[in-house]
């Protein structure tokens, strides 16, 4: 905590501050730029360090109603069930509308389609009786993808070219993890015919690709990768180790077979220097 504020920092070195009511009041990025949020009974004003402002209003569910920023005005509309029905944008008098559809009677809150600014159906989703998505497509059936949920717990995905990829899963530390991908290699599925194992924390331990080449991984107590060995167990094995900053999610040194790269940062996590030493 800082004063009466709660502070959250992520592994991207972004910092979020919340007030005593749990409202986000500041965002700070690694380059020390910040955005502040000020709340009133009427609206929320978001201000950047450069003085640029974005103002929005919310309903009682904290869903956006209006937004204005630098010549752009946006209005959001909802039905009686709080479902987003439309977004209207007005930029210098040019007005566009986008609509959202909910056509599944069994799951009336599930999004089934989007009507774009030209009045054309841009996207369509369908679901099975269990509420799982079974198909996705864009206008005129482009990028049509089908999903089948198999009795053994695996999932089969058929892309728009008719290629089928099968995903097998395992529950690791309470989280569903992919343990095998089987199918024809394609730009959309570069990891076809690969297998994966995980440690007790659910972190990736090994990956075996479609050529049988194994990559192994090790982590520190913070869950950060400290060692990765490619082509493990072969004469071509290549190991990369990483030394991490004790409190920030930033590398201090990355050691590869032919070089060591070292980094220095200031107290806010901004990179001060990067040096490369040949080995």
Each language-model region and where it sits:
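Extended charged/polar low-complexity repeat regions
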Residues: 1-279
């Amino acid at each position: 905590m800082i004063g009466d504020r709660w502070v959250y920092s992520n592994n991207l070195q972004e910092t979020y501050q919340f007030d005593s009511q749990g409202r986000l009041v500041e965002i700070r990025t690694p380059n020390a730029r910040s955005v502040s949020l000020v709340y009133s009974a009427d609206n929320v004003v978001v201000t950047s360090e450069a003085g640029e402002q974005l103002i929005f209003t919310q309903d009682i569910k904290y869903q956006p109603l209006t937004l204005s920023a630098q010549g752009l005005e946006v209005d959001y509309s909802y039905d009686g069930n709080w479902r987003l029905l439309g977004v209207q944008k007005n930029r210098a008098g040019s007005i566009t509308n986008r609509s959202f559809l909910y056509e599944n009677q069994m799951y009336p809150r599930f999004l089934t389609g989007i009507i774009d600014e030209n009045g054309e159906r841009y996207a369509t989703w369908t679901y099975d009786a269990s509420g799982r998505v079974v198909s996705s497509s864009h206008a005129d059936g482009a990028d049509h993808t089908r999903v089948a949920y198999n009795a053994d717990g695996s999932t089969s995905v058929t892309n728009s070219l008719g290629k089928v990829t099968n995903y097998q899963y395992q529950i690791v530390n309470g989280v569903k993890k992919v343990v095998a991908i089987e199918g024809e290699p394609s730009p959309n599925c570069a990891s076809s015919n690969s297998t994966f194992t995980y440690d007790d924390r659910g972190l990736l331990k090994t990956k075996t690709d479609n050529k049988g080449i194994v990559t192994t991984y090790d982590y520190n107590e913070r869950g950060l990768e400290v060692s990765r060995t490619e082509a493990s167990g072969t004469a071509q094995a290549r190991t990369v180790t990483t030394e991490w900053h004790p409190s920030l999610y930033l590398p201090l040194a990355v050691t590869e077979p032919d070089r060591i790269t070292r980094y220095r940062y200031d107290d806010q996590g901004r990179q001060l220097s990067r040096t490369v030493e040949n080995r």
